[in-house]
Amino acid sequence: MKEPGAWNRRNFLATLGATAVAAFPGKVLARSRQAAGVASKSGSVYDDLGVKTIINAWGTITDIGGSLISPETVAAMESASKNFVSIEELLEVTGNRIAQMLKDLPADHTATITSGAAGAIMCGVSGVLTGVDPDKIRQLPDLTGMKSEVIFQRGHYETYGYCPQIRASGTKIVLVDFPEDVHRAINEKTALLYFANYANPLGHIKVDEWIKLGKQYNIPCFNDCAADTPPVGNLTAFNKMGYDLVAFSGGKGLRGPQCSGLLLGRKDLVHAARYNSSPFEPTLGRGMKVGKEEIVGMWKALEIYLSQDQSKLMQEWSAKLDYVAKQLRKLDGVSTSYYVPPIANHVPAMQISWDPRKFALTSKTALDYLGSGNPAVAMWGGGPGASETMEDDCYLTMSSFMLQPGEERIVASRLKQMFHAHPA
């Protein structure tokens, strides 16, 4: 029996959440503002540093900070910063809590909080190779006597930026195109079948077919779904489909800390991934550290995300795009059209196009103009039909789900200024 006043893991998270929610938005928000005033002479730490802020009409992009953390999550992180705890125990408890929160997650699955989706990939692949064997964990990236090959589709590989995280554990990536290639490639060295969810349209083997190949040979399958929330259902859809490990970014649609992520999957593989990461040593993933504040922040952010009315949010995001479109329709030679990306950043988006005979602008010069203001406005020069250089393109793609209230008006004003400043 614990002594009075001793830390009790059973009620730590419940107490923490209740404290943060009960205090918000009054005392905690006031305290946060007071702390911000102490931290910044000007009212903005970025002004103090001379770093220009950005209005994010682009999306959950790591280059510009991903997403903004909610005040409730900040309050939970602040509370977590006030005590020391066992990181190993905190990871176990939050992982179990998250598995309970995701009610559709298969019964033999659990979760762990990671250092972003990239950390989930690196430690998840390592865990598949080593299990919880301390000698094998210590041996990485030397795979002598261990399985060493990861099968990946060529159509995914050509646009995928996270192969270094796969290879970090010493693996060799074997590229395939068609199911018959997979059958030929599988051998006694095959450790994993790897899938990049956003690239599903680019490969010949689709997401549901890929898992069937893994099951046929009893080989674990990993799916990188980093930016694939919303929709909420994606958080469990691929585990239910049969994927053994699924990675999500915490700092994108979930609006958790930018350096956090989620790894969901079979309990044995999730535990193995955790033992290949911080705070355990010696491990390949020792540098994949997530602090206690970020662990708690990721848990709280997910709790908030699951409680939100997603259809209402979609309507709000669409309304912001409608406002900008209405302002731009007043300009002769400018048009707008709506679409929703099929997988990653699956939220309302708008393509803004212009007639090059009326405006001396390309996608690249438009992005440069918007980025030159203070605050800058960030958009995407890509989208359906985009070229690599954007030198000849005449459109931008705008996303609204990272805009703060009222920023759509600034975006519309800046766009109108841009068009007026660049007549053909």
Where do the language-model regions lie?
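Conserved PLP-enzyme active-site core in the AAT-like
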Residues: 13-16, 20, 37-55, 59-64, ...
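N-terminal secretory signal peptides and thylakoid transit peptides that target proteins
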Residues: 1-19
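Flexible, glycine/charged-enriched surface loops at secondary-structure junctions
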Residues: 87-92, 107-111, 285-289, 308-317, ...
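Conserved C-terminal alpha-helix-loop-beta "cap" of PLP-dependent enzymes
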Residues: 329-418
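Metallocofactor- and cofactor-centric catalytic cores in central/energy metabolism, strongly enriched
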Residues: 63, 67-68, 74-75, 79-97
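Structural signature of PLP-dependent enzymes
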Residues: 302-326
